[in-house]
């Protein structure tokens, strides 16, 4: 089987998942808070996330465990391709990413922009994509 066969199967699986998940965007219950907000209409719930992802930054991250970031293992030092999203529903008191999670510091990105971040990280040698 060729590479295109697998790419097509993955794309079909993604489209199927999006079809199944799309009703939740207008009656959000994706997290345990079940806020039922209509994100499609531009409203936001506890997580402050609307109809688009908000990204704070996208970079190669070397602060993860060596098995993820590649440090010290078989000569791989590519880093973990990390995309930091803004907004969170947990509201942990000792959150290490308070500015991103609680203050929602980030920029709305389209699906295409998010995909381009991932491709750029891959081109930079990321060993994985860490969301």
Where are these regions (language model features)?
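Flexible, acidic/Gly-rich N-terminal and inter-domain linker regions that tether
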Residues: 1-78
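Conserved Radical SAM active-site core
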Residues: 47-131
């Amino acid at each position: 089987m060729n590479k295109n066969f697998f790419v097509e199967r993955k794309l079909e699986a993604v489209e199927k998942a999006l079809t199944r998940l799309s009703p939740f965007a207008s009656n959000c219950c994706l997290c345990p808070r079940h806020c039922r907000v209509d994100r499609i209409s531009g409203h936001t719930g506890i997580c402050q996330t609307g109809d688009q992802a908000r990204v704070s930054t996208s970079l190669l991250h070397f602060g993860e465990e060596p098995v993820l970031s590649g440090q010290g293992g078989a000569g791989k030092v590519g880093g973990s391709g990390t995309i930091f999203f803004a907004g969170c529903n947990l509201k942990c008191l000792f959150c290490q990413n308070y500015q991103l999670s609680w203050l929602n510091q980030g920029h709305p990105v389209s699906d295409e922009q998010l995909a381009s971040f991932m491709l750029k990280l891959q081109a930079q040698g990321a060993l994985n994509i860490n969301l």
